[in-house]
């Protein structure tokens, strides 16, 4: 991959040098031919694969319900008419994606400078402690499926993916600079035996651009079928905006630094977001569906306005967190254990691990429907302010029984249980979330719902515990 010539105007990266886009009519016609040629080239190289960590094939995607492309089944359909109709729909989808790609690549943007030129200015000392350019002024490189991901991100920083192309990564991509990936809904697959796909390491000094900080992925779809490693392993600032993860048998995001997930979707994953010790995690407006461990927090986390459905564990809290305005429905079918506090406990949908020095999480304005909750002993008092526990069972450890305050919650169908002792005669060996197998002691519980429920004959529901400042 050669460094582009910044003096040539109107030439888009990823295209041939003889494709100027100065004339709008010639621009559109030229880009149509180039898009068709690129599609034909990537289609012919799909069998052999691209070198240097990248490869793929442009395909039409009719848009399945889960958002990830699957190959059409040639045996599906019982008549030639059905097969012809299906083929027509696929061709229409392919034409739409090609037109969308052409429209995105032919738009005019106020882009004026390449990332390599900014690095040259920074090395000369002209951009020290100075934000001279903005995100919209940095030129975008349209990456082709045969290009090397690591080389493209390190050279251009701002990279866009073609929505009519399926990208395939075949080796680990090491990112040590500021990077911004504009996905445009493109699908990225993995064909590698490496344990990590994107290794976001500590960044070196470089030029500052307004609107770019750390590593950012925007609107990318990751189809991780058959991949058992980590999609992201980050020790720097990582931002995921509208990213889609599906069928990841490993870890989607493993962060040792600062990670922000906004509007992301996790479907059928083993571990969604994992925040290691001393990490800072922010999760907003994300969807978790049929995951084993949606979120694992060992550091600090802010979890706001998310939705979870049929997860074995929506939140395994080993550190501290602020959990507000989330909706969690249903529980998955699993008998996993957790040994985070030294005792083997059955994993619940909301699982707060006991700790002698850490405080309780802030738990407010959450909706729980047909869920289970485990509360280990912590410092202070746990008060789930204005939360709805609809058909939810809460299991409290012995020391946590006296540290929970259930005033101000919607408790019509809640069930509260206290662990009295553990029956050693009913011990069973179960798999643990740490990867090993442990002996799980069966807890003998006591129903204490009426003892802890608020006395509604003495306390009116019209008090301020159920009101908020934004109500009329």
UniProtKB/Swiss-Prot annotation:
It comes from the Viruses. Residues 32-44 have a biased composition (Low complexity). GO terms for molecular function: ubiquitin-like ligase-substrate adaptor activity. Keywords: Early protein, Host cytoplasm, Host nucleus, Host-virus interaction, Modulation of host cell apoptosis by virus, Phosphoprotein. Residues 1-90 are annotated as: Disordered. One of its GO terms (biological process) is symbiont-mediated perturbation of host ubiquitin-like protein modification. One of its GO terms (cellular component) is host cell cytoplasm. Its main location: host cell. Contains a PML interaction motif that allows the subnuclear PML localization. This is E1B 55 kDa protein.
């Amino acid at each position: 991959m050669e460094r582009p010539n910044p003096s040539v105007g109107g030439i888009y990266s990823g295209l041939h040098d003889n494709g100027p886009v100065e004339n709008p009519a010639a621009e559109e016609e030229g880009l149509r031919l180039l898009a068709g040629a690129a599609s034909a080239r990537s289609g012919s190289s799909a069998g052999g694969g691209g070198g240097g960590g990248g490869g793929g094939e442009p395909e039409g995607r009719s848009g399945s319900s889960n958002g990830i492309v699957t190959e059409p089944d040639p045996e599906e359909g019982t008549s030639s008419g059905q097969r012809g109709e299906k083929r027509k729909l696929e061709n229409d989808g392919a034409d739409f994606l090609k037109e969308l790609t052409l429209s995105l690549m032919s738009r005019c943007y106020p882009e004026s400078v390449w990332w390599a030129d900014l690095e040259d200015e920074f090395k000369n000392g002209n951009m020290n402690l100075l934000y001279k350019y903005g995100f919209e002024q940095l030129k975008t490189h349209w990456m082709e499926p045969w290009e090397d991901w690591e080389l493209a991100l390190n050279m251009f920083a701002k990279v866009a993916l073609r929505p009519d192309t399926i990208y395939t990564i075949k080796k680990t991509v090491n990112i040590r600079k500021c990077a911004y990936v504009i996905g445009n809904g493109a699908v990225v697959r993995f064909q590698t035996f490496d344990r990590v796909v994107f290794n976001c390491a500590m960044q070196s000094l470089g030029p500052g651009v307004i609107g770019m900080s750390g590593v950012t992925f925007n609107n990318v779809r990751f189809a991780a079928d058959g991949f058992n490693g980590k999609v992201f392993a980050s020790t720097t600032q990582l931002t995921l905006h509208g990213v889609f993860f599906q069928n990841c048998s490993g870890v989607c995001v493993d962060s040792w630094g600062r990670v922000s997930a906004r509007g992301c979707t996790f479907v059928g994953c083993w571990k969604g977001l994992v925040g290691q010790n001393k990490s800072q995690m922010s999760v907003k407006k994300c969807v978790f569906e049929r995951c084993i461990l949606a979120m694992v927090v060992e550091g600090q986390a802010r979890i706001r306005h998310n939705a979870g459905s049929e997860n074995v564990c929506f939140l395994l809290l080993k550190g501290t967190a602020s959990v507000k305005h989330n909706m969690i429905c249903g529980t998955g079918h699993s008998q996993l254990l957790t040994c985070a506090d030294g005792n083997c406990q059955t994993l619940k949908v909301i699982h707060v691990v006991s700790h002698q020095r850490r405080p309780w999480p802030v738990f407010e304005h959450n909706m729980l429907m047909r869920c289970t909750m485990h509360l280990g002993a912590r410092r202070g008092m746990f008060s789930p302010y204005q939360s709805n526990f609809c058909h939810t069972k809460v299991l409290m450890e012995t020391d946590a029984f006296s540290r929970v305050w259930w005033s101000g919650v919607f408790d019509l169908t809640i069930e509260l249980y206290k662990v009295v002792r553990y029956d050693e005669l009913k011990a069973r060996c179960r798999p643990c979330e740490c990867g090993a197998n442990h002996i799980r002691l069966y807890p003998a519980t006591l129903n204490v719902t009426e003892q802890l429920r608020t006395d509604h004959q003495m306390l009116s529901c019209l008090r301020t515990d159920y009101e908020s400042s934004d109500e009329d």
